[in-house]
Every structure is written in structure tokens, then in C-alpha cells.
Amino acid sequence: MLILTRRVGETLMVGDEVTVTVLGVKGNQVRIGVNAPKEVAVHREEIYQRIQHEKSSDGESA
């Protein structure tokens, strides 16, 4: 895992088209902004896992 340090307002690049910007830090919460092309899905991990679980459940019931 690559670990990077960024301050509020600083950005990191993921590939050529995705940027992740630190918008704010308050206590143990970090607000980030993600700019990505429409064809790149961006989800919180727990939402992504739910989507994957629903996809696999749909496949089993078909």
C-alpha cells in the first residue's frame, strides 16, 4: 500500500484522469473530493461491497 501525506487543499493523482483532493480535516474525519471521468465508478468501500454482494446475490437467484 502506498501511503501519502497531504494537507488540506492538496491533491494527488490516480492515473492520468482521477484526482483526489483533501478538502478538510475535523477530528478523526477527513473530507475528500474525487474528480473522475463518468465511466469511472467512485464509491465508499462499504457501498462498493454492498453493490458487489447484491450483484452476486442476483447471479445466484437467476
Swiss-Prot record:
Keywords: Activator, Cytoplasm, Repressor, RNA-binding, Translation regulation. One of its GO terms (biological process) is mRNA catabolic process. The keyword Plastid does not apply. Gene3D superfamilies: Translational regulator CsrA. One of its GO terms (cellular component) is cytosol. InterPro entries: CsrA, CsrA_sf. Its main location: cytoplasm. GO terms for molecular function: mRNA 5'-UTR binding. It comes from the Bacteria. The keyword Cytoplasm applies. It is found in: Cytoplasm. Belongs to the CsrA/RsmA family. A key translational regulator that binds mRNA to regulate translation initiation and/or mRNA stability. Mediates global changes in gene expression, shifting from rapid growth to stress survival by linking envelope stress, the stringent response and the catabolite repression systems. Usually binds in the 5'-UTR; binding at or near the Shine-Dalgarno sequence prevents ribosome-binding, repressing translation, binding elsewhere in the 5'-UTR can activate translation and/or stabilize the mRNA. Its function is antagonized by small RNA(s). Homodimer; the beta-strands of each monomer intercalate to form a hydrophobic core, while the alpha-helices form wings that extend away from the core. PANTHER family: CARBON STORAGE REGULATOR. This is Translational regulator CsrA. It comes from Alcanivorax borkumensis (strain ATCC 700651 / DSM 11573 / NCIMB 13689 / SK2). The gene is csrA.
